[in-house]
Structures are given as C-alpha cells and as structure tokens.
C-alpha cells in the first residue's frame, strides 16, 4: 500500500502530537485524585528478597555438597576465571534430576536443543513462581514438548553457564541469581 497524499498524513500527525499532552493531563488528574491505593505489589522489595532467597539456596547447596550429596552442584559463571574470588552471586546452583547418557558439553559458540521453563521466585499472586518463558508451548511433559534451538552465546550468563556444564539428556533444576539472569531489566518471554 502506498501513501498518495503525504500532506494529510503530516497534518494528522501534527494534530495527534498537539492532542497527546492534552489527553494525558486529565489522565494525570484522575490518577492523582485517588485517596487510597488498592494496587497489589507483585514483587515487594524484590531485590532484597531475591538476594535473601539466593543466599539460602546457595548455602543449602553447599551444605548438601559438603555432606556428599552428588545431586547438587555449584558453578561459577562462565566468564569469570575459577581462580578469582567472587561473590556468591557470580555462581549458579544446580540440582541434578537425571544424568543424561550423552557425553561432552556445549561450548559458548555452540547451538543446542533445549526444553526449559523460566520461573521467578514466588510472589504475591504466584505462589509457585511466575513462569515467564518456556520452550514447552502447550505440552505438559518433556516427552511431548519440542525442544528449542538456542545459541549458547545469546543467552543470559546464568543460562549459558548451566548449558556449558550439561551433557545430552541431563535434566537439571538451575537456580540463577538475578545478577546472572536479566538483572533489573524487564523480560517478556
């Protein structure tokens, strides 16, 4: 479709641009007139709560590892040398559900096929945690889910770190601190 009369379009844009501040002003009046707020804070004090939860998961994993439990692992993020001292938020924690039959781990530059679900910590409305991303689609099990092809280097540092330690067929629950996930940015799956 081609625009034949550009003058009409320019005039319309100018009118909308002039009306936009006028349309926003009444909206600001209505929102400012509220005497009480019934807004639900979905993630109250999210950063501090996330850090407390992370510290607990990290400590519990290290206790389990020290007790000889081989289903728990702690890995430093892929981009920090193992010899360097780092805060615990530079690590991911893994609970191994199933060890796969495959050998070898993907490199940072590799593509992988993955079934995954991304969930946040439990919140006001989501007692099991909000699922913000998934490769599962409408499937309910890994048997019926189609894996998603991903380039390891395109993922968050936490996700990329986990993948570089996995073998084909591994089934892990991976715990990632916000610093190695999306940080303070909003992600919409």
Segments predicted by a language model, with ranges:
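Cross-family detector of peptidyl-prolyl cis-trans isomerase
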Residues: 2-13, 33-189
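Sec-dependent signal peptide hydrophobic core
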Residues: 17-24
């Amino acid at each position: 479709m081609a625009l034949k009369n550009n003058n009409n379009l320019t005039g319309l844009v100018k009118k909308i641009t002039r009306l936009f501040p006028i349309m926003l002003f009444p909206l600001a009046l209505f929102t400012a007139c509220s005497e009480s707020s019934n807004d639900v804070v979905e993630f109250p004090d999210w950063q501090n709560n996330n850090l407390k939860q992370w510290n607990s998961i990290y400590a519990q994993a290290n206790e389990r590892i020290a007790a000889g439990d081989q289903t728990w692992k702690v890995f430093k993020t892929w981009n920090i040398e193992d010899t360097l001292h780092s805060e615990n938020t530079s690590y991911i924690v893994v609970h191994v559900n199933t060890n796969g039959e495959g050998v070898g781990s993907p490199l940072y530059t590799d593509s992988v096929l993955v079934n995954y679900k991304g969930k946040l910590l439990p919140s006001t409305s989501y007692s099991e945690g909000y699922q913000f991303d998934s490769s599962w689609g409408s499937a309910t099990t890994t048997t019926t889910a189609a894996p998603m092809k991903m380039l390891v280097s395109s993922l968050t540092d936490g996700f990329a770190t986990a993948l570089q330690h996995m073998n084909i067929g591994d089934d892990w629950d991976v715990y990632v601190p916000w610093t190695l996930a999306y940080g303070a940015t909003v992600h919409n799956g």
